[in-house]
Amino acid sequence: MSGGSRSSQIRSIRFALQVKGVEATARVLGIRLQHLEARGSDDLESAFSATARERADALLVTGSSTFLTHRARIAELAMKGRLPTMLSFRESVAAGGLMAYAVNMADFVQHAAVYVEKILKGAKPADLPVEQPTKFELIINLKTAKALGVAIPQLLLLRANEVIQ
């Protein structure tokens, strides 16, 4: 890896893996993808304008702290464009997004605290195993679904960990 900070390089790799997984699933389902890039709030308007030009049926927002930071604006633009949106954070759904399949943040933070405790007690970070989150939650915003005219199947509602009325 060359150029950029280590954390930005890791984010780039994580994003590439997310995209690869989405592309593979889209191929299996016969869904045409349109890639849009938004690195900050200034890019959101143009990205949503592109979804309108391309007549997108829905939007998948990948997990990024940028998108978490601008969750209210993303929800607003999605509603304005009448675009059902799948997000990566529970907070984004609470801000008005349609749905998310997201890491349970309380579980994630608790797990991170265990790592910090081990390091503070003398463990070398390089010796600790890399672990992925294992608990995910489905969150659905019925108020947003109604406003968009999207019917959420009863089976999906029953599987949801949280339904926002």
Outline where the language-model segments fall.
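Short hydrophobic alpha-helices and adjacent helix-cap/hinge residues
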Residues: 1-165
